[in-house]
């Protein structure tokens, strides 16, 4: 560890500082303000003739990103989480002894505490004239080169801390993510929703069609499943009397990783008694309007080279109409299992003859429709067979009162009128068991306790989930989900695999 020559040189400098009575890792140093506050508060000197205010004695801190020695003075650039600032100090300003120590031992990457006053250099740069410089942390590992930075995409994800040091835009993206979560939370609180927390380990893998992660509870001697969705617990709370609930938390799905999928991801799920899925679509449009406004993004945003228009009401189109309009498929084809199988095979897609009509229609949708839904589009009225927890339509028993929101070819939200008939729910679970026995690893398990809860009566309720990660991708124009997750899942390095062997 820390065995390359540059790291060893820095370790020696840290030892030398200790020998001089300077702790390279002091337990506490207090700064007065951020660099942004310093710039904002003292910007008035830019309008003054003197271009300086020596009555100020401000204390700031930051990481050294640039260090330039010019004879008896040093110019440096420090950076905190918001911005950067040039600092200047000399033998005269900090004293010859300290100046000599700093000149010899300070390096790019070190974190310093600086006290001084604002001034403008001869070249016109707003700066801090330091009277005191203290080492807050000695960096042992050198930063990547300024102009090359951390360019290997895998290394950026594995060493997110270095990525954030080197790329201010990365920090900005995660500040946006934090703000998005905060805005969503306050949006629902202001609508009268109650935020709750439900279990992360489930006795039954339920709430969505997905393959779970399995763990083992040693004390109880039973298997547990990391949750794939909080849905069934949130609906139990509606049964219990909470009429509007939401949860922002993690879900886990033991499936593939790609540009839009990470095995660990964040969602908001919310349930609203005495409302229907049309109310949820209205609520979703209102939420998007709020986010675009508070993030100052305007009514049209760019994502992956495409312009997305939020100025108009979101399109609402039925599942079957979308197959025809966007998929270019004939109405008689989408209603005929054999014709669908023939079409899929002819176009080189997998065609499982064991699938029933609704699942085959879903194959058509995935392959011919989804990527063409660029502007915000609610696709409504899904096949009932692929919607095991949704309420059946009163007009058509093969249709679920369900929608999904698509933007730029990606699903961002899924909502529906909740199934509250316990007998119907029980039958749906039995069909899911049949599907699992036939080889569908993602089919739901039977959850008799949930059916029992419905037996006590759940009021007419609508529920929805929104993927926070994909939403942030959209709002920050990022193509990969790993760009909006601080520490995304990564494949093991070869060295890690060898150690296990």
UniProtKB/Swiss-Prot annotation:
Cofactor field: Mg(2+)
Residues bound to Mg(2+) 1: 404, 411
Catalytic activity reported: tRNA(Lys) + L-lysine + ATP = L-lysyl-tRNA(Lys) + AMP + diphosphate
Cofactor binding note from Swiss-Prot or TrEMBL: Binds 3 Mg(2+) ions per subunit.
InterPro entries: Aa-tRNA-synt_II, aa-tRNA-synth_II, aa-tRNA-synth_II/BPL/LPL, Lys-tRNA-ligase_II, Lys-tRNA-ligase_II_N, Lys-tRNA-synth_II_C, NA-bd_OB-fold, NA-bd_OB_tRNA
Sequence positions that bind Mg(2+) 2: 411
GO cellular component: cytosol
Keywords, comma-separated and alphabetical: Aminoacyl-tRNA synthetase, ATP-binding, Cytoplasm, Ligase, Magnesium, Metal-binding, Nucleotide-binding, Protein biosynthesis
A GO molecular-function annotation: lysine-tRNA ligase activity
GO BP: any one term: lysyl-tRNA aminoacylation
Entry similarity comment: Belongs to the class-II aminoacyl-tRNA synthetase family.
Protein name: Lysine--tRNA ligase
Organism of origin: Campylobacter jejuni (strain RM1221)
């Amino acid at each position: 560890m820390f065995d390359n020559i540059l790291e060893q040189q820095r370790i020696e400098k840290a030892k030398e500082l200790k020998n001089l009575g300077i702790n390279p890792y002091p337990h506490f140093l207090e700064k007065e303000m951020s660099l942004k506050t310093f710039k904002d508060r003292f910007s008035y000197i830019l309008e003054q003739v003197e271009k300086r205010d020596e009555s100020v004695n401000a204390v700031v801190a930051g990481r050294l990103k640039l260090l330039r020695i010019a004879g008896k003075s040093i110019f440096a650039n420090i950076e905190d989480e918001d911005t950067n600032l040039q600092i200047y100090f000399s033998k005269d300003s900090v004293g010859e002894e300290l100046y000599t120590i700093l000149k010899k031992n300070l390096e790019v990457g070190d974190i310093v505490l600086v006290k001084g006053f604002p001034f403008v250099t001869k070249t016109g740069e707003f700066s801090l004239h330091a009277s005191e410089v203290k080492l807050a942390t000695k960096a042992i590992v050198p930063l990547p080169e300024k102009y090359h930075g951390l360019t290997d995409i895998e290394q950026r994800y594995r060493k997110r801390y270095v990525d954030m040091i080197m790329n201010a835009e990365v920090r900005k993206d995660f500040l946006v993510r934090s703000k998005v979560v905060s805005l969503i939370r306050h949006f629902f609180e202001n609508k009268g929703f109650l935020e709750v927390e439900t279990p992360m380990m489930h006795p039954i893998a339920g709430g969505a069609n997905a393959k779970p992660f399995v763990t083992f509870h040693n004390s109880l001697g039973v298997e547990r499943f990391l949750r794939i969705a909080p849905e069934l617990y949130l609906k139990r709370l509606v049964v219990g009397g909470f009429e509007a609930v939401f949860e922002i938390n993690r879900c886990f799905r033991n499936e593939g990783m790609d540009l839009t999928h990470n095995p660990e991801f964040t969602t908001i799920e919310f349930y609203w008694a005495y409302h229907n899925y049309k109310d949820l679509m209205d609520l979703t449009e209102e939420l998007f309007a709020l986010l675009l406004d508070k993030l100052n993004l305007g009514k049209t945003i760019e994502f992956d080279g495409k312009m997305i228009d939020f100025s108009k009401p979101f399109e609402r189109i039925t599942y079957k109409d979308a197959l025809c309009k966007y998929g270019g498929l004939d109405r008689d084809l989408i209603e005929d299992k054999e014709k669908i199988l023939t079409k899929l095979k002819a176009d080189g897609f997998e065609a499982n003859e064991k699938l029933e009509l609704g699942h085959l229609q879903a194959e058509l949708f995935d392959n011919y429709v989804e990527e063409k839904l660029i502007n915000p589009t609610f696709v409504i009225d899904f096949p009932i067979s692929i919607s095991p927890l949704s309420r059946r339509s009163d007009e058509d028993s093969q249709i679920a009162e369900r929608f999904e929101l698509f933007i730029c070819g990606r699903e961002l939200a899924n909502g529906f009128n909740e199934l509250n008939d316990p007998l119907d729910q029980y039958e749906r679970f039995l069909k899911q068991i049949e599907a699992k026995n036939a080889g569908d690893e993602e089919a739901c398990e039977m959850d008799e306790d949930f059916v029992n809860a419905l037996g006590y009566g759940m009021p007419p309720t609508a529920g929805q989930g929104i993927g926070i990660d994909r939403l942030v991708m959209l709002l920050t124009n990022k193509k990969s989900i790993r760009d909006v997750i601080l520490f995304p899942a990564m494949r093991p390095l070869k060295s890690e695999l060898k150690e296990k062997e």
